């Protein structure tokens, strides 16, 4: 089983086709076949093995996580062929899917939202997605009270700030002027520039994930399979970054 898992990781990293899996992979020999690897990979996805492994690693290493500063951001994946939750995104010049990822202070992924179409902005169904991410963290027993949650100005809204406050965290979100010419009335919102700069560890994590070429372009129709496979990649990132 370990060799099969190594083959799956190799496929994800190189982006090769399944039938070409063993062209440059010498760690396994006959009677292995790419059909065997694909069979177990599909079986593990349907059984939720990757997702369970992701949560198991978070539970095992939760004391090593830097939960004092959390970071929320989204990442887009280009979509080829027909696929669920895929729409045109003008910045990427193509059809994309988007997923929200919550990382700790070092950039390790600790929570992942559902995949949504790429034509939506960052605030689309933000409360539902954020609640699901926080439920994942709670399930793993990760303590996040009194933490700073960094997010860019695309996430600046009252609903999200209230949701963060309800969980006894501090929303460190850059204010979005939204075409205002003057200063906003009322009490000035909390914002720590030094803590906010730490959120760029997300870019390192997303760059590492993008090094997995299978993830760079989505060819899988069912969004649940893709989400599970993404969790597998993030699980590896949590272990080896």
Model segments located where?
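Short alpha-helical elements
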Residues: 1-241
């Amino acid at each position: 089983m370990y060799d099969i898992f190594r083959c799956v990781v190799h496929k994800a990293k190189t982006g090769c086709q399944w039938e070409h899996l063993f062209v440059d992979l010498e760690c396994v020999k006959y009677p292995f076949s790419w059909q065997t690897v694909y069979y177990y990979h599909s079986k593990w996805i349907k059984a939720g093995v990757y997702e369970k492994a992701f949560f198991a690693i978070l539970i095992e290493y939760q004391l090593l996580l830097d939960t004092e500063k959390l970071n929320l951001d989204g990442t887009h994946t280009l979509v080829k062929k027909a696929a669920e939750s895929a729409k045109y995104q003008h910045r990427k010049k193509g059809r994309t899917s988007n997923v929200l990822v919550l990382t700790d202070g070092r950039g390790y992924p600790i929570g992942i939202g559902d995949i949504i179409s790429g034509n939506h902005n960052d605030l689309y169904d933000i409360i539902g997605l954020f609640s699901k991410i926080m439920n994942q963290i709670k399930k793993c027993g990760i303590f996040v009270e009194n933490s700073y949650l960094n997010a860019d100005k695309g996430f600046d809204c009252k609903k999200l700030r209230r949701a963060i406050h309800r969980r006894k965290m501090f929303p460190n979100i850059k204010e979005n002027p939204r075409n205002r010419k003057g200063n906003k009335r009322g009490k000035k919102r909390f914002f720590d520039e030094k803590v906010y700069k730490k959120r760029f560890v997300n870019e390192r994590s997303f760059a590492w994930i993008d090094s997995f070429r299978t993830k760079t372009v989505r060819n899988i129709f069912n969004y649940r399979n893709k989400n599970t496979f993404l969790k597998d990649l993030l699980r590896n990132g949590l272990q080896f970054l």
